């Protein structure tokens, strides 16, 4: 939607092995395909400009210590990277950034969000990622007072992600409608799975919840409730969840993995090293 997401497209490929090279490549004003090789140790947030594909080479490409900041830019793809030990967010999408695809990455042991999307960003897919050993996973909408920028935006799809013993925000949603959370595997989530707040509309569909006492609920902290529709979810040793209200129609066609098969499909397919890059 919104013209599709192609990243760097057919642009030439640059391989980066240092923090300086990574920062320069992702911050370029021209379209590029960037391959991250080995472990890059860095700090702070690196600005990612429009029309970039950022790919991890092999199974072990790692960005450690820093994060990627997509700030008002568009058409960015991030795939097959191990993010760890970030000191802010691993991936931050903000200021009306659009057409972003975050796919087949691992996130562990960072400070704040693994994938935080906020400030009017739109048309984003977060798919086939694994989050483990981490607290604040995926925030969608940063403030109860930001309705003016966020209402009508923050339309995000989360599918086939593996929330592996992570704590909270899978996602925590303000204002976005529809937000589509489907075919994810929640295993041993210690805080809560999905929270719909501040008049958001979230469809929680075909997910597999295991050992998760609070799979989804309305409101969170000081944030008032949103709407949440749940259908065709599969539960093993988990709570029932809280629903209410209605959600805008999903604007695209999609095929659901059979909910009882989601655990197998996602644990075999999510995270790095699964897509042959």
Regions found by a protein language model. Give the residues of each.
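Residue-level marker of regulatory loop/turn positions in helix-turn-helix DNA-binding domains and
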Residues: 70, 94, 118, 150, ...
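Right-handed parallel beta-helix
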Residues: 51-57, 74-85, 97-111, 121-142, ...
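Short aromatic-glycine motifs in intrinsically disordered, low-complexity regions
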Residues: 6-8, 41-46, 196
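Acidic Gly/Asp/Thr-rich repetitive segments characteristic of extracellular carbohydrate-active
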Residues: 1-35
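Structural detector of coil-to-beta-strand junctions
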Residues: 67, 90-92, 114, 137-139, ...
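Extracellular beta-rich repeat passengers
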Residues: 173-177, 182-186, 190-277
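Extracellular beta-strand-rich solenoid/capping regions of secreted or surface-exposed proteins
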Residues: 23-30, 38-55, 61-80, 84-97, ...
